[in-house]
Swiss-Prot record:
<comment type="function">
    <text>Binds directly to 16S ribosomal RNA.</text>
</comment>
<feature type="region of interest" description="Disordered">
    <location>
        <begin position="1"/>
        <end position="23"/>
    </location>
</feature>
<protein>
    <recommendedName>
        <fullName>Small ribosomal subunit protein bS20</fullName>
    </recommendedName>
</protein>
<dbReference type="InterPro" id="IPR036510">
    <property type="entry name" value="Ribosomal_bS20_sf"/>
</dbReference>
<dbReference type="GO" id="GO:0070181">
    <property type="term" value="F:small ribosomal subunit rRNA binding"/>
</dbReference>
<dbReference type="Pfam" id="PF01649">
    <property type="entry name" value="Ribosomal_S20p"/>
</dbReference>
<dbReference type="GO" id="GO:0015935">
    <property type="term" value="C:small ribosomal subunit"/>
</dbReference>
<dbReference type="InterPro" id="IPR002583">
    <property type="entry name" value="Ribosomal_bS20"/>
</dbReference>
<keyword id="KW-0687">Ribonucleoprotein</keyword>
<dbReference type="GO" id="GO:0005829">
    <property type="term" value="C:cytosol"/>
</dbReference>
<dbReference type="GO" id="GO:0006412">
    <property type="term" value="P:translation"/>
</dbReference>
<keyword id="KW-0689">Ribosomal protein</keyword>
<keyword id="KW-0694">RNA-binding</keyword>
<dbReference type="GO" id="GO:0003735">
    <property type="term" value="F:structural constituent of ribosome"/>
</dbReference>
<keyword id="KW-0699">rRNA-binding</keyword>
<comment type="similarity">
    <text>Belongs to the bacterial ribosomal protein bS20 family.</text>
</comment>
Amino acid sequence: MANIKSSKKDSIKSRKKKKLNASKKSMIKTLIKKVKIAILSGDKLKSELAFSKIQPILDRYSAKGLIHKNKAARHKSNLKCKINAL
């Protein structure tokens, strides 16, 4: 544990940020699952609507560095290909 006051504050801040980032990553996974479920149901309109919700979120979080930009691009590409195949 840190002894210096600023180090203690940094430690607290990093723990809070870690919880927030974990929450955001969990949200991304949940939204991706919703898109995949919509694709499996075969409803193109529903899957496109779900995809339109997740696309800007992936872009935003990849720009902020929460997820890697290539990972965001891969998810968007794979989901869009599956939607177009419907």
